[in-house]
Amino acid sequence: MDALVEDDICILNHEKAHKRDTVTPVSIYSGDESVASHFALVTAYEDIKKRLKDSEKENSLLKKRIRFLEEKLIARFDEETSSVGREQVNKAYHAYREVCIDRDNLKSKLDKMNKDNSESLKVLNEQLQSKEVELLQLRTEVETQQVMRNLNTPSSNWEVEKLSCDLKIHGLEQELELMRKECSDLKIELRKAKQTDPYQEDNLKSRDLQKLSISSDNMQHAYWELKREMSNLHLVTQVQAELLRKLKTSTAIKKACAPVGCSEDLGRDSTKLHLMNFTATYTRHPPLSPNGKALCHAASSPLPGDIKVLSEKAVLQSWTDNERSIPNDGTCFQEHSSYGRNSLSLEDNSWVFPSPPKSSETAFGETKSKTLPLPNLPPLHYLDQHNQNCLYKN
């Protein structure tokens, strides 16, 4: 717009200069016509001048308006660009601020943890130093005590220790020699066994079978002895229960109706308990018959439990003999099918505490699960009669 205004001014100036340069012609016409033309030119000039001024004003207004619009557009553009940038800047600032806050918090926590760790380390170091001091004191005390003991120990103790060590060494040497001899003997036997004929091998097998049969017999014998002892225990418990009942009833009616002799007999009977070879025997006075003779006399004696091997014939013969010696009137005992149903009356004259099982009988419990050929066993009623014979043997 400035260029346009300058062009208009230049046109006016050019017209002015052109008017100055133009040569006024010689007026051919009269004076009135020249005056009129001059007046028309002046008016036209003034009109053109006014128009130029108006156009200049309009141009200046337009320039101002254009500048205002340009400034407005620039301000809008700046505002738009600045709003987006400000938001991003604000977001970045907030994020940076949060990161700084987190960093400060973590730093404070780290400082606190470092302080706590340093304090705990100090405490632990102090405790460790105190423990080390205590250990050093204890070590010094122990060392001093050992030194004092070594200084105070007489020569006799050293000699005794030396003699004991020598005896141990001598015993170990003897055991070593015995083991060497046994090893050599076993080697010789092994060589001989390799050189033997098949007949001797059969003999060895038969011997092994005999040993197995003997061990099975031992197991059966131990089983029957255990069964007999269990039946005896059952009988003993029944007798004790009857005695306790009798004692309770007698103490209740003793002052009223029982004579003095009955209590004395009970006391005398209760004290007759003897221990003989790990077997307890209780003996009572037998009841008297009308003729004054004892029906069942003699206390029962336990069978010897140390016999390991018994033949079937001997066992059966002893049982049958004992069975024949039992009276048939049934006054002394009553036969039952198992030891769990045996019973005794208060008139029985003896009962036995069975001896505890011996170490030789432990093989039964250990080899119970093995299957071995068992010999023909006697029937069950023989065992029950044998138990009764042990209790009522004449």
UniProtKB/Swiss-Prot annotation:
Q: List the disulfide bonds.
A: none
Q: Does the keyword Ubl conjugation apply?
A: yes
As for PTM, the annotation reads: Ubiquitinated via 'Lys-48'-linked polyubiquitination by TRIM38, leading to its degradation.
- Superkingdom to which the source organism belongs: Eukaryota
Q: Which UniProt keywords apply?
A: Coiled coil, Cytoplasm, Phosphoprotein, Ubl conjugation
UniProt region (Homodimerization), positions on chain: 1-197
Where the protein is mainly located, per its record?
cytoplasm
From the UniProt record, list the coiled-coil ranges: 40-76, 102-196
Q: Which InterPro entries match?
A: TBD, TBK1-IKBKE_adapters
GO CC annotation, single: cytoplasm
The segments labelled Disordered in the record are 355-379
Give the start-end ranges of region Interaction with TBK1 and IKBKE.
216-257
Compartments, as annotated in UniProt: Cytoplasm
Q: Which residues carry this modification: Phosphoserine?
A: S318, S355
Q: What does this protein do?
A: Adapter protein which binds TBK1 and IKBKE playing a role in antiviral innate immunity. Activates serine/threonine-protein kinase TBK1 and facilitates its oligomerization. Enhances the phosphorylation of NF-kappa-B p65 subunit RELA by TBK1. Promotes TBK1-induced as well as TNF-alpha or PMA-induced activation of NF-kappa-B. Participates in IFNB promoter activation via TICAM1.
Query: Tell me, how does this one assemble?
Result: Homodimer. Interacts with IKBKE, TBK1 and TICAM1. Interacts with TAX1BP1. Interacts with CALCOCO2.
Q: What is the recorded name of this protein?
A: 5-azacytidine-induced protein 2
